[in-house]
From Swiss-Prot:
It comes from the Bacteria. It holds the Pfam family FlgH. This is Flagellar L-ring protein. HAMAP family: FlgH (MF_00415).
Length: 231
């Protein structure tokens, strides 16, 4: 019996350990910098004044618009949500049935236990009250900046950007990852764009090390908070 208990305990421990989300690792290929493509040399047109691939713009800026270009994203995320719910149900009912006379005569019957006369009247009262309330609130904020690269230019001119930033501290590593779609018109003249202007944004802020582990519950605590705990 003791051996079976040990096996079950170890199996549960390994199962709970496997449910823990893996720690993020650097050098994720998805967030790796995208280098600009080397353009193929344009065919030279002998005898022409203008050659393809050598054009310049009279009015141009330094904003990102090609694959491999760098763009700085200003993190300005702030969310706040609250919800209140309450309900109340009340119901009262009563009934009074009195049978004092029937066909002009008094109606009564003898009590089989005491022998005394008793009437046939009845009275009923009932009430029910039910009430409940609930409240929930959540707020988050993230500020800072991260510089990423343009990974793809869509046919409509939308820029797909992604990148990550790792910071090594004395208690571990902190990382910020972001991916999404940026409209070229939303890019400022200093080549920055706010994170609130990114479509389909995927923003991750996480970390590794002793500080990150201290904020996570242990494997036994996760068992008590899991659906496997019957109480």
């Amino acid at each position: 019996m003791s051996r079976l208990l040990i096996v079950v305990s170890l199996s549960s421990a390994f199962a709970l350990a496997g449910c823990v989300a893996p720690a993020p690792k650097p050098n994720d290929p998805y967030y790796a910098p995208v280098l600009p493509r080397t353009p193929l040399p344009a065919a030279q047109n002998s005898g022409a004044i203008y050659q393809a691939g050598f054009e310049t713009y009279l009015y141009d800026d330094r904003k990102a618009y090609r694959v491999g270009d760098i763009i700085t994203i200003t993190l300005a995320e702030r969310t706040q949500a609250s919800k209140n719910a309450s309900s109340s149900i009340s119901k009262d009912s009563s009934a009074n049935i009195g049978l004092g006379s029937l066909f002009g005569g008094a109606v009564s019957m003898a009590n089989p236990l005491t022998g005394n006369s008793m009437s046939l009247g009845a009275e009923y009262d009932a009430s029910r009250d039910t009430s409940g309330s609930g409240q929930a609130g959540q707020s988050n904020s993230l500020s800072g900046s991260i510089t990423v690269t343009v990974s793809e230019v869509l046919p409509n001119g939308i820029l797909a950007v992604r990148g990550e930033k790792w910071m090594t501290l004395n208690t571990g590593d902190e990382l910020v990852r972001i991916a999404g779609l940026v409209r070229q018109d939303d890019i400022a003249t200093d080549n920055t764009v706010s994170s609130t202007r990114i479509a389909d944004a995927r923003i991750t802020y996480s970390g590794t090390g002793a500080f990150a582990d201290a904020s996570q519950p242990g494997w036994l605590d996760r068992f008590f908070m899991s659906p496997l705990w019957p109480f």
